Amino acid sequence: MVAEVDSMPAASSVKKPFVLRSKMGKWCRHCFPCCRGSGKSNVGTSGDQDDSTMKTLRSKMGKWCCHCFPCCRGSGKSNVGAWGDYDDSAFVEPRYHVRREDLDKLHRAAWWGKVARKDLIVMLRDTDVNKQDKQKRTALHLASANGNSGVVKLLLDRRCQLNVLDNKKRTALTKAVQCQEDECALMLLEHGTDPNIPDEYGNTTLHYAIYNEDKLMAKALLLYGADIESKNKHGLTPLLLGVHEQKQQVVKFLIKKKANLNALDRYGRTALILAVCCGSASIVSLLLEQNIDVSSQDLSGQTAREYAVSSHHHVICQLLSDYKEKQMLKISSENSNPEQDLKLTSEEESQRFKGSENSQPEKMSQEPEINKDGDREVEEEMKKHESNNVGLLENLSNGVTAGNGDDGLIPQRKSRTPENQQFPDNESEEYHRICELVSDYKEKQMPKYSSENSNPEQDLKLTSEEESQRLKGSENGQPEKRSQEPEINKDGDRELENFMAIEEMKKHGSTHVGFPENLTNGATAGNGDDGLIPPRKSRTPESQQFPDTENEEYHSDEQNDTQKQFCEEQNTGILHDEILIHEEKQIEVVEKMNSELSLSCKKERDFLHENSMLREEIAMLRLELDTMKHQSQLRKKKYLEDIESVKKKNDNLLKALQLNELTMDDDTAVLVIDNGSGMCKAGFAGDDAPRAVFPSIVGCPRQQGMMGGMHQKESYVGKEAQSKRGILTLKYPMEHGIITNWDDMEKIWHHTFYNELRVAPEEHPILLTEAPLNPKANREKMTQIMFETFNTPAMYVAIQAMLSLYTSGRTTGIVMDSGDGVTHTVPIYDGNALPHATLRLDLAGRELTDYLMKILTERGYRFTTMAEREIVRDIKEKLCYVALDFEQEMAMVASSSSLEKSYELPDGQVITISNEWFRCPEALFQPCFLGMESCGIHETTFNSIMKSDVDIRKDLYTNTVLSGGTTMYPGMAHRMQKEIAALAPSMMKIRIIAPPKRKYSVWVGGSILASLSTFQQMWISKQEYDESGPSIVHRKCF
């Protein structure tokens, strides 16, 4: 197939010009200007061009594209031909080219199929059915390729060879599938033809079915064992062939049948690459739905996407891109593992704790801030002794915040829970308790400072302003809170630092001189930009001067103030001790929280480990469960096999019981029925002669009401019908030994069981006889009627000639059986009839009766009615004989009247018979008397012997057995001896055996066979019929 290029019109499907038609692809508009725009190629429509024309065109039009010449492949215009396109000549003109002069008679009949069935049977009798013509074609090849199912069925019945190959190594099944003759193909499959035989191109029957888009035939081939992965010489499986030929429906069918999507042709191309090269977006989409590998490369190292890009198949490129994106998303979703996420969370948690030890972020709290006015005195004390408390402040700061995370005192663990998840309430309550203690202390100090040094309204105003600024700062500069736990206010931390500094100053024995000044300076210095400690406004102007008398008062006041300061200092020390105690408790709480956090991390790691152990345990349990299921299935299969074997044993026991129940006494003895064309003979096995012998005729009233005073019946059988022949229409249900009217034949059997033998057929096994060349359909119909209509418990069908041979005590010989309707010559070797040497002659007693009526009519005697015909038959059986030398007998009768005989008719009239009594049987040896061109009975017997194997001819010559009522004429054995001796080799010994009771020899042979102890193993039981149907008669009755 040639790839479709989006920017160019589709290539034309017109046949290619020049001698390259069978080798090159389709022509496109790059090659001929006349193709452009129309999409069709007009070159080559008027005939092939010569080489000079091709060279001229080539020189004018420049480079040829890869659709036209293999030398242009790889130019980038089409990727299909990068490795060479496939030769589709195997699929071109599937039917045979037949010339009449090349075929013989049988092959012509098989090809045309316009031959009568009986003529075709005669052809098959004289011709080898497996004969091949010049092109190695058999009759089965020709009939299958041309759809002559009737001929095919007849050839299969003749057991012709099924897997014969013609000159292209194709079987008859291959030709039937290739020519889409489904009926013939199904018949061949049912008879066991191998569907996997490749032809010279490597194609099997499934390849041709896929090429023809015949899904029903492909399904049938797969049911009969066709290989779905067979490859032809191009490396194409049926799936690759369907993709290459853009057969979307059969490709979809093969995908459902689990065809290998990753199979490669001889160039390493997958089905996807072939679909891309062929430009079939629908097949590409169908293959992508099956998750096919899109990254596979052919032998040139190119992928399907590269072919699509180079061929400008934009739709296919988009399909491949979308498929790849879906695969990437699927892979990314599969790679996300919950256990791995939890592990990463634990690692991040540990790194966060490490970071909290090195850096302390600014704390935030939801608790109300401590009033800043209450801190001013402590802050002034801090400024006064600034040089002595730096280390202590650092230690205190580090001690308070030890173990803090990024967000405050109690860091929040990173997990899948919401960010506002809180720690347990006991930790939060402990923290709140510490903060309340600090608040109480500040409230105690705040009234003193606020009453002496500040204006309440001004302080409240300043506090509100500072609070609003702090909130703005927290909104703009503070990091996002990870916890809702309360944090210690910065002012509270600063107050603790101040008290620690005062205590340090006590230890070093600081002087009291300048304390107020230092305190004042510390307060002034502490007034920073953030306005935590605003300066107190003096009520006197700065430039105000005090007199000297007031100066002394000032010093006395200063001493009082100093004394107050010492008192306050002592109170501060007491408070400092309490704060240290609370601080230690706070550190303990933080350490406890850290230990609990590490414990929770450890628990998480333990949970992860336990989770992985549980997963492994679940996997082991699943594996154990699968093992148990598999073992259960094996045990179930074994139990079913045991049940099946026990069932078979029980069936065999039932069969044995049924056989044992059928004892050979008069009540359940085997019924033997010989169905002849003229007479029906019936009786019980083991008897010397049949108990019932009656004509095989059925009579129906000619008009309703003709038998009005009598008990009128719809039909009459046998002697009763013969006695009423004047008012009945008589019919013979058998013609030339073959049953033609099954309704009348069923009436004869019913009459045999209930009127002649007076037995119930459902209580007796039955042995029926048949003609040697009885059709298979007749055998099956006979079996069906016995089992379904008469419900017989068992039955067997035997060939009449074999039973005649058994009567003479032989198992090897040739039987010439001539009855009322047909004559057969059947060679038998070691108890087996030879069908290829069996011959049939439609000349017997009925034809002799008609001939005798004719010659008597020439003498002036008229016999026209059925009753008169019976009179003629009686004359034939009582007076006629076979002349040893016909010419001599004719001369004797002409010269003397002493050989004439008289016969009295029922009405008293006497007729005279001269040469008619030996002229009538002479027609058996000279059928030309009757206007027939066939051979006589002696030549037919000789021809059967000659068709047999050379090694057994001697046994046949010495064991020639006569059978049937027509062989009862006196002189028959001597005439046969004389005629066959004249035909056989001079040194060959001839022996004709003519049993005295040969009129009933067929029935007697059946009686002998049915009385054998081994006969029970030969017959067909009702159970076997129910299991296999009527076709079982072909397997058990040979």
Swiss-Prot record:
Lineage of the species this protein comes from: Eukaryota, Metazoa, Chordata, Craniata, Vertebrata
Biased composition (Polar residues): 448-457
Single Gene Ontology MF annotation: protein kinase binding
Keyword flag Coiled coil: yes
Membrane keyword on record: no
Protein name: POTE ankyrin domain family member J
Residues forming coiled coils: 605-661
ANK repeats: from-to residues: 135-164, 168-197, 201-230, 234-263, 267-296
UniProt keyword list: ANK repeat, Coiled coil, Repeat
Region (Disordered) residue spans: 332-493, 507-561
Compositional bias of kind Basic and acidic residues: 340-355, 364-387, 429-446, 458-493
Protein's organism: Homo sapiens (Human)
Sequence intervals crossing the membrane: none
A Gene Ontology term for the protein's cellular component: membrane
A biological process from GO: axonogenesis
Entry-linked SMART domains: ACTIN, ANK
Signal peptide: none
Alphabetized InterPro entries for the sequence: Actin, Actin/actin-like_CS, Actin_CS, Ankyrin_rpt, Ankyrin_rpt-contain_sf, ATPase_NBD, CC144C-like_CC_dom
Family: In the N-terminal section; belongs to the POTE family.
Segments for region (Actin-like): 666-1038
Pfam annotation, one family: Actin
